[in-house]
């Protein structure tokens, strides 16, 4: 048996009275739910990201072909599937009038009625239950947004943002406990994820509301970045047992920055409480008019714009900015690439991550080079200069490979933008 099939949306109020008179059906029931974007028949799966739906399956034969009618307990949705052995059977098939009169729509190629979408979002003609989705999004370790076109941009973006709250709080606590370079970098990354989403797709939120949170996060992250640089330099000098005249000044600057970041961390905890309140909005009160539009087509032009901004940044040779922008685009490709059902986004994200790593390495070398400016360490500074040159050359090769992927990604986004699915 091949996967050749036709699928039809039926008038469920009449279909079973007709079937009872004309066909002999075998009925089975099972629970349908989505686990890690794969269908599961379990009713009590802890990792499931939606409520279980009771699906009734009626099997029978029509013109000697196997047929299935799927009925769900949440609404009057009924789907007829007719299965074929080969293309000739499909081409010559014609529904008998008793069923043809009950067909509302041919949904063979309509992904909104695919089983995984039905399992996650219920009736494709639904009012999306955002509060229910939040319960799953905020507790999942790895939230992947694979959704049908019918979910709004406002709901989709907030699902991703709410899933980042728990890891953000955890990394914030880790920073306050350790205050070392590793914990600073981890906190920086999770903050950057939030900022990248809010800046890139901020047009779906009320501008004034969003700016309150975005302004604080940007200021906090700027200070945290400076602290990361000072911490890295101080730790490097201590490990390498290198003494420079300005070390005492450097350590004092680092200490002042650390105290400031700790104070602002407590403010961040309060800001996050308010942000969670906004993300739980169930009435589109904090949404812009754009937020009510469909998710995929709304995000596509915003995604493309972010790519163009990154490409412009590459030519600036400001390696710190290149690293930040590559990281931001990596976040977007990782979190939202699955929306567009193409493996190219994962490969694109991998290349962006490589560019970010190389750019950050150049920045570290430059931090050391600046710190030892004027010091009598000619051999060390010569080695640093060589490391910088090698890293720049390596980064240029990474950029060239990325350009080949950019056009492919933009073509995919263009399709969604133009057709509006």
Model-inferred region functions:
Residues 1-421:
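Phosphate-end processing signature that detects enzymes handling 5′-triphosphorylated RNA
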């Amino acid at each position: 048996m091949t996967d050749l099939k036709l699928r039809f949306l039926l008038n469920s109020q009449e279909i079973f009275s007709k079937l009872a008179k004309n066909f002999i059906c075998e009925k089975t029931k099972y629970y349908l739910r989505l686990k890690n974007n794969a269908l599961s028949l379990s009713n009590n799966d802890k990792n499931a990201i939606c409520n279980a739906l009771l699906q009734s399956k009626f099997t029978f034969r029509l013109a000697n072909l196997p047929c299935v009618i799927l009925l769900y307990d949440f609404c009057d949705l009924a789907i007829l599937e007719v299965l074929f052995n080969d293309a000739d059977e499909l081409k010559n098939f014609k529904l008998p009038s008793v069923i043809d009169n009950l067909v509302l729509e041919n949904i063979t190629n309509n992904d909104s009625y695919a089983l995984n979408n039905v399992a996650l979002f219920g009736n494709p003609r639904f009012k999306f239950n955002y509060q229910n989705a939040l319960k799953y999004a905020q507790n999942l370790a790895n939230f992947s947004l694979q959704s049908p076109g019918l979910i709004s941009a406002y709901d989709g973006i907030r699902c991703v943002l709410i899933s980042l709250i728990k890891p953000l709080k955890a990394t914030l606590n880790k920073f306050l406990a350790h205050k070392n370079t590793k914990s600073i970098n981890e906190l920086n990354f999770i903050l950057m994820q939030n900022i990248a989403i809010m800046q890139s797709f901020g047009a779906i939120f009320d501008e004034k509301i969003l700016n309150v949170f975005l302004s604080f996060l940007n200021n906090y992250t700027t200070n945290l970045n400076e602290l990361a640089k000072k911490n890295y330099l101080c730790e490097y000098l201590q490990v390498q047992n290198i003494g420079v005249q300005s070390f005492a000044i450097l350590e004092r600057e680092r200490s002042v920055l650390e105290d400031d970041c700790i104070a602002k961390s407590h403010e961040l905890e309060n800001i996050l409480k308010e942000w969670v309140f906004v993300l739980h909005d169930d009435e589109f009160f904090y949404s812009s008019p754009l937020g009510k539009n469909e998710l995929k087509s709304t995000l596509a032009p915003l995604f493309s714009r972010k790519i163009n901004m990154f490409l412009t940044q590459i030519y600036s040779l400001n390696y710190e900015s290149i690293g930040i922008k590559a990281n931001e685009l990596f976040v977007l490709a990782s979190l939202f690439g699955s929306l567009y059902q193409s493996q190219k986004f994962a490969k694109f994200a991998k290349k962006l991550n490589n560019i970010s790593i190389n750019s950050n390495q150049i920045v570290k070398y430059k931090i050391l080079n600046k710190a030892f400016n004027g010091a009598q360490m000619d051999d060390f500074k010569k080695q640093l200069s060589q490391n910088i040159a090698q890293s720049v050359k390596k980064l240029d090769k990474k950029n060239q490979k990325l350009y080949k992927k950019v056009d492919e990604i933009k073509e995919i986004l263009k399709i969604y933008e133009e057709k509006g699915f």
